[in-house]
Amino acid sequence: MSDTSNTPDNDGGKTAGGKPAAARTEAKAPPKSARRRSRELALQGLYQWLLNRNDIGAIQAHLHDAQGFNKADREHFDALLNGAVREEARLTAAFEPFLDRKVEELSPVERAALLVGSYELVHCLDIPYKVVINEAVELTKTFGGVEGYKYVNGVLDKLAAQVRAAEVAARR
């Protein structure tokens, strides 16, 4: 009299958690949104521009031809890249009071992420400030140094409290 339905060799087609054996496959990461892809490409363009101040039109054209650009929100990408370059001085002046070092001492990735996040906080009022900050943090985690995302988070959180005071107050 043996019951083989739940032995280690025969788990009845289920995992230890009771899930069907077919559910044992690795979970795939959700596909990136078009806006996230546009932010990634804008960050890459700003990085190139910050390093060598090449013509932004040439950088933009190169990124339009980049693999995966067809999955990006082209309008948002163009607005981020061109807007951040056009308003670099104004955006930097907005977040600079919240830095604990000179702007020139920031890594190019941190600086580019701050420019993208600052531009969105100031100009993309349809995007909640928490989403703007989270997206900049994710960019920094993906492309930046080990702890850079914490710094970007802190700076943009303080900037959001200043430029979107009513929205921040309503959510806290």
Curated annotation (Swiss-Prot):
Signal peptide: none annotated. SUPFAM superfamilies: NusB-like (SSF48013). It comes from the Bacteria. PANTHER family: ANTITERMINATION NUSB DOMAIN-CONTAINING PROTEIN (PTHR11078:SF3), N UTILIZATION SUBSTANCE PROTEIN B-RELATED (PTHR11078). Keywords: RNA-binding, Transcription, Transcription antitermination, Transcription regulation. GO terms for molecular function: RNA binding. GO terms for biological process: DNA-templated transcription termination; transcription antitermination. It comes from Cupriavidus necator (strain ATCC 17699 / DSM 428 / KCTC 22496 / NCIMB 10442 / H16 / Stanier 337) (Ralstonia eutropha). InterPro entries: NusB-like_sf, NusB_fam, NusB_RsmB_TIM44. This is Transcription antitermination protein NusB. One of its GO terms (cellular component) is cytosol. Residues 1-37 are annotated as: Disordered. Involved in transcription antitermination. Required for transcription of ribosomal RNA (rRNA) genes. Binds specifically to the boxA antiterminator sequence of the ribosomal RNA (rrn) operons. Belongs to the NusB family.
